[in-house]
Structure formats: structure tokens, C-alpha cells
């Protein structure tokens, strides 16, 4: 299993089985038949052990959207051979974005914000007051429906609303608070 061709095939099988959910890649016996049938020294137990070790590292890296340099350091600290480390690093460089997108799509179940636009306008009158001359922000949110159970997958919703100065300040404070929390979690 120290040949790049075979180890890369194992990683490709892992990608198809675990992330792409390929029906042809259901069991490790299939991997043994497809790739390692000519190698008598490679047992199903060895394939399973190596597969699980690779999957553990890739899963950890994918869920934390690990940078390539961090991934390389983790692989270097593991007990993989040099050839296997090179294959894993190459695999992650090539498939990082693809795996992240697959995980992202499978974990989203609500609408997503596709576009936000805004402008400042002057409110001149209302029902109660004939002349106001007060600045307001007009916000427009375009949402994309990502619910896979719905037949209208491409349906987009448009939400428009006005905010006065106080509402805008509150919203900005909340956004800043969210940003601080996200930054604290990413460190």
C-alpha cells in the first residue's frame, strides 16, 4: 500500500463512498476487488485500518475547513509513510474545495442570503405627520430557497424593508456582536 497509485486509489474510493455517495462504492470489499486484487500482501483488515485512518483525518480537516498548511502538519505528525503523506497532501489540495462544498450543501436546510442591497432615502411624510425630512435606509434582501424537499428549488424570495437611524444602529451592533463571536471561534 506504499505505492502512490494504490494509496491514491484508496483516497479516491473514500471520496466517492463517503462524500459523493457513489452507489458503486458501498463496501471495502469492492475496493479490494477493484484495486488490490493483484496484491496478496494487502489484506482487507489492512485496507480497513488505513481507510479509517485516512477518513478520520480527512473528516476532521473537512469539518473545520482546514487550510492546506495545517493539514500537511497534521499528516506529518501521523504515522503515514512519506509516500502516503505526499498522496494525502495532494488529495487534500485537489479535493478540499469539493469536499467542503458537499458538506456545506448537505448541512444547509434553510434559505440562504444570496444578495443584500441598500440605499439611503429621505422620508418626507407619513400618515400622521405631513412633513418629516428624516433619513431612512431601504434594505433589500434576496433569499435563495435551498430546501431540497421542495419542488421549487430555484425559487427566490425578495424582502424589502425600511429602517430608521435607531433601528440601523441596533442592527449594526448585532452584526458587530456576531462578527466578534465568529472571530473568537475561528482563532
Curated annotation (Swiss-Prot):
GO CC annotation terms, alphabetical: endosome
GO molecular function: copper ion binding
Coiled-coil residue spans: none
Pfam families in UniProt: COMM_domain (PF07258), COMMD1_N (PF17221)
Disulfide bonds: none
Any single GO BP term: negative regulation of protein localization to cell surface
Transmembrane region(s): none
Domain spans labelled COMM: 112-186
PROSITE patterns per the UniProt record, alphabetical: COMM
Subunit structure: Component of the commander complex consisting of the CCC subcomplex and the retriever subcomplex.
Summary of the function given for this chain in its UniProt record: Scaffold protein in the commander complex that is essential for endosomal recycling of transmembrane cargos; the commander complex is composed of the CCC subcomplex and the retriever subcomplex.
Family: Belongs to the COMM domain-containing protein 1 family.
Name under which the protein is recorded: COMM domain-containing protein 1
Protein species of origin: Dictyostelium discoideum
Amino acid at each position: 500500500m506504499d505505492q502512490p497509485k494504490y494509496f491514491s486509489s484508496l483516497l479516491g474510493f473514500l471520496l466517492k463512498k463517503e462524500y459523493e455517495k457513489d452507489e458503486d462504492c458501498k463496501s471495502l470489499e469492492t475496493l479490494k476487488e477493484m484495486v488490490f486484487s493483484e496484491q496478496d500482501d494487502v489484506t482487507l483488515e489492512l485496507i480497513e485500518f488505513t481507510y479509517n485512518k485516512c477518513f478520520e483525518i480527512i473528516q476532521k480537516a473537512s469539518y473545520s475547513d482546514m487550510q492546506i498548511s495545517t493539514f500537511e502538519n497534521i499528516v506529518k505528525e501521523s504515522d503515514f509513510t512519506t509516500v502516503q503523506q505526499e498522496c494525502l497532501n495532494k488529495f487534500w489540495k485537489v479535493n478540499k474545495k469539493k469536499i467542503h462544498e458537499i458538506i456545506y450543501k448537505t448541512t444547509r436546510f434553510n434559505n440562504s442570503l444570496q444578495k443584500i442591497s441598500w440605499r439611503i432615502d429621505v422620508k418626507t411624510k407619513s400618515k400622521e405627520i405631513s412633513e418629516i425630512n428624516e433619513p431612512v435606509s431601504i434594505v433589500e434582501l434576496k433569499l435563495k430557497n435551498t430546501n431540497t424537499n421542495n419542488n421549487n428549488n430555484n425559487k427566490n424570495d425578495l424582502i424589502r424593508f425600511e429602517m430608521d437611524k435607531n433601528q440601523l444602529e441596533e442592527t449594526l451592533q448585532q452584526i458587530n456582536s456576531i462578527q466578534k463571536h465568529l472571530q473568537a471561534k475561528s482563532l
